[in-house]
UniProtKB/Swiss-Prot annotation:
This is 1,4-alpha-glucan branching enzyme GlgB. It comes from Thermosynechococcus vestitus (strain NIES-2133 / IAM M-273 / BP-1). The gene is glgB. The lineage of its organism: Bacteria, Bacillati, Cyanobacteriota, Cyanophyceae, Acaryochloridales. Keywords: Carbohydrate metabolism, Glycogen biosynthesis, Glycogen metabolism, Glycosyltransferase, Transferase. Its EC number is 2.4.1.18. The active site is at D431, E484. Catalyzes the formation of the alpha-1,6-glucosidic linkages in glycogen by scission of a 1,4-alpha-linked oligosaccharide from growing alpha-1,4-glucan chains and the subsequent attachment of the oligosaccharide to the alpha-1,6 position.
Length: 766
């Protein structure tokens, strides 16, 4: 016996922080000669021998001190790639010894960068990675658990027995092990023993793939083998400023957009039927569509309607459907509800090849308490604050990340980068930013701790957000980083070098509330609330705002958008058209939730899919046609998007006609030669001679009329356009005498070609 009984006992009881010191091969002196001592701890093994392929020799191993701790001595100069022949339960198997492969992947520099919070691609080091060491293929595992006594890899390959693959501790509390012979598809977890001896089974925080809920094991996968076809899209994105482009976002929850029958199994990339994932307990006959099926159905739908981007409610792995994805346990794993990581890559790839960008909701503000997740990860408060006054959201029943800890911050910063790097996404929308920025968010007096200056601002969270945005824009110019921030925190969408948080867009929650309040009231009373319509332009240029009517506005008893509108059925649809036409002509990028485009009546229900049957009825067909035309018009007119965030891009014609509840304004293109005129009538009262001032003489073509017959309107309008009169109005030399339809928006544009032709004809006649 060349090792002490105490050391063997530590291995047997799984209490050794570095099993490589005992197990594997070690050169020793025996009778004045150098020999190799090979040791192995193999629970359940009846007998074991060492195979040396180079010498074509087999060396029996002997139990030492413990019936399953084996050792043998091999008198050779070099011992490479030896194998263990194991007899157990009447079966024989041959494996490479994991403890013959020391430190194959993680360097001291990796550990240093991680410890200071600056290893931007730590996901290429921690987690589970296919690796070939000395010609032997296997999987390398690494996990950060600094306060653990021991960590093991468990899985189907070792019958979930933590004694068989004990990991070795490296610097800064990182544990690692290379297991030969494993490959893609292996299920695994980490068995973590804390200092008191309690054992926790945890999914891999850096795992790329997990089992469908309710199972929780991580799955080994290879993210680098997918062949992308979107290089042209990525190259164009890199050289494009998205703030000067049209952005019209269709917000989607993939699990409730459309369901399929459980009797119709999905077909995988290999052409074989796959196991369907049931959509909800209350709908046992329904299943989720896969990422590939969604690519075939959702992308053409979005493309037809003219949206520029799809925004996905969180697709990172989460255990509870009812959280909508906002309680994440697998930050590096697209949810397996809809397929594999390669399937999600295919979805994004197909979006790009069809000219559609992909934004994903990202949730760095909190995480759930599920036992297999990040909570109490190594037996201590590792990812979360230990003090519940900083580490818990009681309102949501979730935990708050410790943004002041370098390794936790690194986990999140690298995660944001990961989705751009590995999945080619085009943007993130950061959820619940206000809950991160304020220490007293959702807390009563005495339930929170002030910052070092005595204030309520979470300085660590603010610095974290700056770091995230600085990093992702450094690697991927041309992307979007959108903040859902509901307070007046300054400079949210300003660059970090100017003192901002570094986002390039912020949801305009004030505009959303003002508009929904305004449009939900009886039109007669709108004259007394005219400020709801005009107020947003007083502060619009303080941030880069995105106008969003999101999923949050169609749940929890709020009714869907069409249900918020007053009046009879005709007026409800007219109000809806008026609201969205105003939204698409107001400065700012656009986001709207699924179902709004065809006026779904029922609230969004995560357990069901959309009310597609409504499209058999003409009013819903007409509103869908309205949205398609509105989107395509928006994208075709640079004046409606190219100067969203410059004061010169917007000009009121008249914002003071509260008596009629009418506003009119001009949107200018960046060269100030092209412009559109917008007139909004927010009451059911039409106006046959409504005059507005315009900047130039000529024929103004009616590009869009939300009251058109094809949209279900009354078809009032201006017969295709109007000539401007040389009649000064609104401090302008020329004016238009318009017919304003009820509850409608008109978009007009100077037709320079017709104007020049008419002038030439007039001069010729003269």
């Amino acid at each position: 016996m060349t090792v002490s009984p105490e050391q063997i006992d530590r291995i047997v009881s799984n209490q050794h922080h570095d099993p490589f010191e005992i197990l594997g091969c070690h050169q020793i002196q025996q009778n004045g000669q150098s020999v190799w001592a090979v040791r192995a701890y193999l629970p359940n093994a009846e007998r074991v021998s060492v195979l040396c392929p180079e010498q074509r020799q087999e060396y029996p191993m002997t139990p030492v001190h413990h019936p399953h701790f084996f050792e043998c001595h091999i008198p050779v100069a070099e011992l490479n790639n030896y194998q263990l022949k194991i007899y157990e339960n009447g079966h024989e198997r041959v494996i490479y010894d994991p403890y013959a492969f020391r430190s194959p992947k993680l360097t001291d520099f990796d550990i240093h960068l991680f410890a200071e919070g600056n290893h931007h691609r730590i996901y290429e080091k921690l987690g589970a990675h296919l690796l070939t060491v000395d010609g032997v293929e296997g999987v390398y595992f690494a996990v950060w658990a600094p306060n653990a006594r021991n960590v093991s890899v468990i899985g189907d390959f070792n019958h979930w027995d933590g004694r068989k693959h004990q990991m070795a501790r490296r610097g800064n509390g990182i544990w690692e092990l290379f297991i030969p012979g494993l490959s893609v598809g292996e299920r695994y977890k980490y068995e973590i023993k804390n200092q008191e001896g309690h054992i926790y089974e945890k999914s891999d925080p850096y795992g790329f793939y997990q089992e469908p809920r309710p199972k929780t094991a991580s799955i080994v996968t290879d993210l680098n083998s997918y062949e992308w076809g979107d290089s042209d899209w990525l190259e164009k994105r890199r050289h494009t400023d998205p703030l000067n482009q049209p952005i019209s976002v269709y917000e989607v929850h993939l699990g409730s957009w459309l369901h399929a029958s459980m009797e119709d199994p999905p077909i995988g990339a290999d052409g074989q039927p796959q196991e369907p994932v049931q959509a909800a307990e209350l709908k046992p006959w329904a299943r989720f569509l896969t990422y590939r099926e969604l690519a075939a159905k959702l992308i053409p739908y979005v493309k037809e309607l003219g949206y520029t981007h799809i925004e996905l409610l969180p697709v990172a792995e989460h255990p509870f459907d009812g959280s909508w994805g906002y309680q994440v346990t697998g930050y590096y794993a697209p949810t397996s509800r809809y397929g594999s990581p390669h399937d999600f890559m295919y979805f994004v790839d197909q979006c790009h090849q069809n000219g559609i960008g992909v934004i994903v909701d990202w949730v760095p503000g909190h995480f759930p308490k599920d036992g297999h997740g990040l909570a109490f990860f190594d037996g201590t408060h590792l990812y979360e604050h230990a003090d519940p006054r900083k580490g818990e959201h009681k309102e949501w029943g979730t935990l708050v990340f410790n943004y002041g800890r370098h390794e936790v911050r690194n986990f999140l910063v690298a995660n944001a980068l990961f989705w751009f790097d590995k999945y080619h996404i085009d943007g993130i929308r950061v959820d619940a930013v206000a809950s991160m920025l304020y220490l007293d968010y959702g807390r009563k007096e005495g339930e929170w701790i002030p910052n070092e200056y005595g204030g309520r601002e979470n300085l660590e969270a603010a610095n974290f957000l700056r770091q995230v945005n600085h990093v992702i824009f450094s690697y991927f110019p041309g992307i979007l980083s959108i903040a859902e921030e509901s307070t007046a925190w300054p400079m949210v969408s300003w660059p970090t070098y100017m003192g901002g948080l570094g986002f390039n867009l912020k949801w305009n929650m004030g505009w959303m509330h003002d508009m929904l309040d305004y449009f939900s009231m009886d039109p007669w009373f709108r004259q007394f609330h005219h400020n709801n319509v005009t107020f947003s332009m007083w502060y619009h240029h303080s941030e880069n705002f995105m106008l969003a009517l999101s999923h949050d506005e169609v749940v929890h008893g709020k009714s869907h958008i069409i249900g918020k509108m007053p009046g009879d059925r005709w007026q409800k649809f007219a109000n809806l058209r008026c609201l969205f036409a105003y939204m698409f002509t107001h400065p700012g990028k656009k986001t709207m939730f699924m179902g709004m485009e065809f006026a779904q009546w029922s609230e969004w229900n995560v357990w069901s899919d959309l009310e597609w049957h409504l499209l058999q009825y003409e009013p819903h067909q007409q509103i869908k046609r309205f949205f398609g035309d509105l989107n395509h018009l928006y994208r075709s007119q640079p004046a409606l998007y190219s100067q969203d965030f410059k004061q010169e891009g917007f000009e009121w014609i008249d914002c003071s006609d509260n008596r009629h509840s009418v506003v009119s304004f001009i949107r200018w293109d960046k060269d100030y030669q092209d412009f559109v005129v917008v007139v909004c009538n927010f009451t059911p009262q039409p106006h046959s001679h409504y005059r507005i001032g315009v900047p130039e003489h000529g024929f103004y073509r009616e590009l869009f009329n939300s009251d058109a017959r094809e949209y279900g309107g009354s078809n009032m309008g201006n017969l295709g356009g109007k000539w401007a009169d040389e009649w000064p109005y609104h401090q302008r030399r020329y004016s238009l005498d318009l017919c304003l339809p009820p509850l409608a928006v008109l978009i007009l544009k100077l037709d320079r070609e017709k104007t020049v032709a008419e002038r030439a004809r007039y001069n010729l006649q003269s």
